[in-house]
Amino acid sequence: MTWQSDYSRDYEVKNHMECQNRSDKYIWSPHDAYFYKGLSELIVDIDRLIYLSLEKIRKDFVFINLSTDSLSEFINRDNEWLSAVKGKQVVLIAARKSEALANYWYYNSNIRGVVYAGLSRDIRKELVYVINGRFLRKDIKKDKITDREMEIIRMTAQGMQPKSIARIENCSVKTVYTHRRNAEAKLYSKIYKLVQ
């Protein structure tokens, strides 16, 4: 996979994603120390409840934190990060604002499952459920982003104006605003705030 690295941040993201191919780096993003440490400890803590060995999990799985801090990179580069984790069992850890995007990637990619990290959720139980391969489409209770909404989110994230998006998508400006409003309702946030 080749990344076009125009900025140092792109280089950092590339290095973090390439780390995932090494067996000792199975949690992305490793630069989020609290998430990395917390999830590592949680996986060790639930060891007796999962069918696979910890070594197999470290080797075959990638756990991705879809936090609002990193959503911009995931939206703008979804083909790249999905290619980077090809062949791995990908588990998305989704906060409330990223649930609809996680569901979109689950439906449209080879994602093993989604752990919804809401405040009232039992993350241990959900993590065991996904690792053990029991997460199914019927488990998705929340909305998912549609293909058209995702295209509009990507173009908005790139700084494109609704009029330009309408031309590219061959639709009216009103339709662009409607899709954007629908996506924002599912994301519980304005798109521009998520992709800053």
UniProtKB/Swiss-Prot annotation:
Family under the similarity heading: Belongs to the EcpR/MatA family.
Lineage, top ranks: Bacteria, Pseudomonadati, Pseudomonadota, Gammaproteobacteria, Enterobacterales
Function, as annotated: Part of the ecpRABCDE operon, which encodes the E.coli common pilus (ECP). ECP is found in both commensal and pathogenic strains and plays a dual role in early-stage biofilm development and host cell recognition. Positively regulates the expression of the ecp operon. Also represses expression of the flagellar master operon flhDC, and consequently prevents flagellum biosynthesis and motility. Acts by binding to the regulatory region of the flhDC operon.
Expression induction: Negatively regulated by H-NS. Positively autoregulated. Also positively regulated by IHF.
Highest taxon listed in the record's lineage: Bacteria
GO molecular function: DNA binding
DNA-binding region as annotated in the record: 162-181
One GO process term, biological-process aspect: regulation of DNA-templated transcription
Gene name tied to this protein: ecpR
Origin species: Escherichia coli (strain K12)
Pfam families: GerE
Sequence ranges assigned to domain HTH luxR-type in this UniProt record: 138-196
Subcellular location: Cytoplasm
Additional detail: Expressed in strain K12.
Alphabetical UniProt keywords: Activator, Cytoplasm, DNA-binding, Repressor, Transcription, Transcription regulation
Record protein name field: HTH-type transcriptional regulator EcpR
Gene Ontology CC, one term: cytoplasm
